[in-house]
């Protein structure tokens, strides 16, 4: 039996986090949920996720700064990172892309099924 793919869900809004957590768990993923950038960096090393679903606007350390640190840390530099954010301006997308994000999804422009499909795509799974 193949082990579950591990997703690190980084979202400071607890309602949004619980919705994404529940749906991804239903899809068969093993989920670890954290609520700020500091927790995200620690969990990325401890949990060893297959993919990080990362909010941009968070307390303590922004998602952009988390992404920058992940990409400059040997143990995490190759992790797949999908940014899921309310920030819809091109400058924000370009900033994330310059930092090495694998995908950038704007919350107001996607439904949860789209998020699941993008996660599966980046993990090489059938959609």
Regions found by a protein language model. Give the residues of each.
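Non-catalytic signal-transmission and effector/linker regions of two-component phosphorelay proteins
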Residues: 1-6, 113-127
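Conserved acidic carboxylate
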Residues: 11
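Two-component/phosphorelay signaling modules centered on CheY-like receiver
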Residues: 14-32
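Acidic, metal-coordinating helix/loop segments flanking the phosphotransfer/catalytic sites
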Residues: 33-51
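Active-site residues of response regulator receiver
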Residues: 55, 85
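The feature encodes the CheY-like receiver
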Residues: 59, 77, 89
